[in-house]
């Protein structure tokens, strides 16, 4: 399969730079996986698409202010993007500089350069940085960090993004990108879903900056997926197995929830799914056998991205590309602050040939 098979033309005017005034007021394109039928509506229509007893699985990661600006003590400007927090004093990060710092280099971070840190080691493209400060990494980031808006939202971060670029149920700090399908859920909608009898469970996957890295190979099978930490606790496993047993659907909110659930299913030894607390490099593309997820809430993804490949594996390649073509024609808003899709699983997708 070629990466270019997942390309599509997207006018720049359709990239959303700000969210809708109300979280749940965005548009919703529904794709029936088995038939490819499309329905246009608004996000609150989700209430009518879910049945009592269906299980919504959310990702409760919280975005940290992961972008830091400063300079090397030797003079050159740097930009630091946290990939993950290693402990209370150390981070693993991407560093942009005219010349990469060497181990032992002193870094002065923050708008006033008041935070002192040391680059202690290099791991491939990533740098290990230790803060020389009494405060925890999280306290330092909250004090001097900027929200790491995706590169296609071409504007500086604003104070409002600290709230807008978080889900209302975010709980566990550690992500450098929001699980954006969840941004559309507000408390009134969540209350209505609960009142209808829709069940809810929460996994944690700390989205890394690697999620924005382009696929740099021509053939999909040659791509090496970035690693992210995921948690699927026992209560989620119990909720999934109970939903399946009573004939209800498991609906993943976002591709990160999909990757968490399917990672736990892949690693399971004795059951459909078992608790999972580990790094995952799961790469889902056409031909992948889904085991857990029956329906998916997701945003519109970048051309040639691993995420549009994941959706194609779920709904079928042709159905997915047709849906994206319709979304462009109907002027849906794309990417992190854009509109959403509701997709049901296409069991025939695994047999579809792509690019032939």
Curated annotation (Swiss-Prot):
Alphabetical UniProt keywords: Cytoplasm, Queuosine biosynthesis, S-adenosyl-L-methionine, Transferase
Source organism (scientific name): Escherichia coli (strain 55989 / EAEC)
Name of this chain's protein: S-adenosylmethionine:tRNA ribosyltransferase-isomerase
Main location: cytoplasm
Role noted for this protein: Transfers and isomerizes the ribose moiety from AdoMet to the 7-aminomethyl group of 7-deazaguanine (preQ1-tRNA) to give epoxyqueuosine (oQ-tRNA).
UniProt-listed InterPro entries: QueA, QueA_dom1, QueA_dom2, QueA_sf
EC number per UniProt: 2.4.99.17
Any single GO CC term annotated in Swiss-Prot or TrEMBL for this entry: cytoplasm
Localisation: Cytoplasm
Keyword Cytoplasm: yes
GO terms, biological process: queuosine biosynthetic process; tRNA wobble guanine modification
Catalytic activity of the protein: 7-aminomethyl-7-carbaguanosine(34) in tRNA + S-adenosyl-L-methionine = epoxyqueuosine(34) in tRNA + adenine + L-methionine + 2 H(+)
Known partners and oligomeric status: Monomer.
